[in-house]
Amino acid sequence: MSQQVIIFDTTLRDGEQALQASLSVKEKLQIALALERMGVDVMEVGFPVSSPGDFESVQTIARQVKNSRVCALARCVEKDIDVAAESLKVAEAFRIHTFIATSPMHIATKLRSTLDEVIERAVYMVKRARNYTDDVEFSCEDAGRTPIADLARVVEAAINAGATTINIPDTVGYTLPFEFSNIISGLYERVPNIDKAVISVHTHDDLGMAVGNALAAVQAGARQVEGTLNGIGERAGNCALEEVIMAIKLRQNLMNVHTRINHQEIWRTSQTVSQICNMPIPANKAVVGSGAFAHSSGIHQDGVLKNRENYEIMTPESIGLNQVQLNLTSRSGRAAVKHRMEEMGYHENDYNLDDLYDAFLKLADKKGQVFDYDLEALAFINKQQEEPEHFRLEYFSVQSGSNAMATASVKLACGEEIKAEAANGNGPVDAVYQAINRITDYDIELVKYQLGAKGHGKNALGQVDIVVSYNGRHFHGVGLTTDIVESSARAMINVLNNIWRAGEVEKELQRKAQNKEHNQETV
């Protein structure tokens, strides 16, 4: 009988560590809801003790996600576990994930401890976590470089202490599939109480082995796989969950396991993560890359035309990537747009129909026909703009030429006030940015400017993603229109609003902290 492999997504924890700019609470929630819709069993959404912002993100997601188990990370430290529990207590169901290093190198040089002390601390912290929940995961950091006898001792002790999931990470992506398989099978041979816990694996891609190691571990008995969408993560990244999921689906006859993932949501969830995290998907990326179903060889094209299965082991439709349709114009009504969004898998709470339809009409007037990928892009921008905006672009104009310095005039709404400025620059985008900087007077540094296209040919939308540095923090902004200069301006306005909102959040957190201190003093 086929057994279930639990899918544990850590895009919002391990994956976010690779980003140049931290995600906002709203952005994290948007990804979490997409993961829930895709059907992940467990989502690790943050490290609450690390910052007030991370605590708020975990708490917000824990409150709103209903169909996936929400998990938070904690070191084997009392405060970490207590704070994680506090952030998660509003969830329908939650898990605390605690970890400590077990390899000789980490124990000696990082922890400056001994294996016996590590086991003692792991046992104590697992028991502490069990005071808050009966779902506790324990990870042996750097398990891939831990002698199997030592690893077995730690695992047995953690299970006896109450851990219900034991995670075996290849933290530095060092092992090869046959080695990793031997580690898992070795634990099954050496740990007498191993049947009392789910064995999980968490693999990294430093040698390009993350997916191979995960699948080898499943064959050896692991029943939970941890990873991220699109494989994002520190260094070379994490195990790409979409690849593991589709490998299990397509080779189920060989592996005799299954997942509960809604495969039709894979492509859209992948795109959501890519857009929000500002991490483009390589064209040759397995499963979700733009070239995954493209055939350029004449022999291959001929074979596909005769029978798709000649060269396609899966269909675009199997991951929710349907054919582009050209059925929407400026004459299409609100109901038609709503119906098309529903056909693409969107729900009413995924976007504001009034705002989306207004944006659709403006785009349709410019382009004539609106494609599915246009609607996807508009829905993404629509979601980003749901948060309150302090800055709003009212108007801009640019003059430039091959032998003339670019000049830009910009008018912004700044709260209740309208301000305008003009500036010169090294090109139209720089001129617009100089004018915006004069109005807002934020001391920011542009760290990254990235221009991409949404769609195909001359009717593609221009997407601009930027990252700026402000007060030691990085902030991300995105703009999407048919005009790349306007997209650039809107990306900068998006960044400025993100900076402003971050400041408002900090003020609110300070106010709450002061009120808490005041209440304690008066007790």
From Swiss-Prot:
Regulatory domain: annotated segments: 392-523
Ranges of residues in domain Pyruvate carboxyltransferase: 5-267
Keywords: Amino-acid biosynthesis, Branched-chain amino acid biosynthesis, Cytoplasm, Leucine biosynthesis, Manganese, Metal-binding, Transferase
The protein's Enzyme Commission number: 2.3.3.13
Pathway it works in: Amino-acid biosynthesis; L-leucine biosynthesis; L-leucine from 3-methyl-2-oxobutanoate: step 1/4
GO BP field: L-leucine biosynthetic process
Amino-acid positions noted as binding Mn(2+) in the UniProt annotation, renumbered to this chain: 14, 202, 204, 238
One GO CC term, this protein: cytosol
Gene3D superfamilies cross-referenced by the UniProt entry: 1.10.238.260, 3.30.160.270, Aldolase class I
SMART domains xrefs: LeuA_dimer (SM00917)
Record GO terms (molecular function): 2-isopropylmalate synthase activity; acetyl-CoA C-acetyltransferase activity; manganese ion binding
InterPro entries from the UniProt entry: 2-IPM_HCS-like, 2-isopropylmalate_synth_dimer, AIPM/Hcit_synth_CS, Aldolase_TIM, LeuA/HCS_post-cat, LeuA_allosteric_dom_sf, LeuA_bact_synth, PYR_CT
UniProt enzyme class: transferase
Cofactor: Mn(2+)
Cross-referenced SUPFAM superfamilies: 2-isopropylmalate synthase LeuA, allosteric (dimerisation) domain, Aldolase
Enzymatic reactions: 3-methyl-2-oxobutanoate + acetyl-CoA + H2O = (2S)-2-isopropylmalate + CoA + H(+)
Location in the cell: Cytoplasm
Subunit structure: Homodimer.
Protein function: Catalyzes the condensation of the acetyl group of acetyl-CoA with 3-methyl-2-oxobutanoate (2-ketoisovalerate) to form 3-carboxy-3-hydroxy-4-methylpentanoate (2-isopropylmalate).
Family listed: Belongs to the alpha-IPM synthase/homocitrate synthase family. LeuA type 1 subfamily.
Protein name, per record: 2-isopropylmalate synthase
Lineage per the UniProt record: Bacteria, Pseudomonadati, Pseudomonadota, Gammaproteobacteria, Enterobacterales
